[in-house]
Amino acid sequence: MASPSFCLFAALLALVSWQAIASDPSPLQDFCVADKHSPVLVNGFACLDPKYVTADHFFKAAMLDTPRKTNKVGSNVTLINVMQIPGLNTLGISIARIDYAPLGQNPPHTHPRATEILTVLEGTLHVGFVTSNPNNTLFSKVLNKGDVFVFPVGLIHFQFNPNPHQPAVAIAALSSQNPGVITIANAVFGSKPPISDEVLAKAFQVGKGTIDWLQAQFWENNHY
């Protein structure tokens, strides 16, 4: 029978190993610029031959025009990840600018592969996230210019501009080169093909007619 000390060591080793694989893998060289044309399929992208790498692979020109906020939810998320900057490959980070119209929101969503840290540049935001089952505890805060808030990886979170007259702007950093996003309403009511209305009616404890109406709506994508 294994000794208690060995069992403890094995448990700690398993925990450390899990933590090591719970985020983007660490780079094994100075950089690994994404080769988007490589036929090699890996978790991420294969490396471009370093002799073809230039400064432009680590660069994205400034977008001086204010992004549009004319969609139904009143926000525009401009994500800069490995698809826009190939040099981010293996570096485990990306960034997004979020513009909010007056009373606009970035609706409840989750990033399956990243923690997010958000800084308000202009205006005021009501933000929050909800913990996992069974507690489903809401942690929320009103942020002003310069304030910072963290959304843990995988948890549902949101931002809302409560000002009916002024827009707001925020910058978010995310701990993955490709954090992904699942907007809850879009995924549940706008999936293709649609989820059975019988399933959703029972899940939300409403009539099928309500579900059919929700599924008939156009679910806005505010990520560009």
Swiss-Prot record:
Residues 1-22 form the signal peptide. Keywords: Apoplast, Disulfide bond, Glycoprotein, Manganese, Metal-binding, Secreted, Signal. Mn(2+) binds at H109, H111, E116, H157. Glycans are attached at N76, N135. It is found in: Secreted, Extracellular space, Apoplast. One of its GO terms (molecular function) is manganese ion binding. One of its GO terms (cellular component) is apoplast. This is Germin-like protein 8-9.
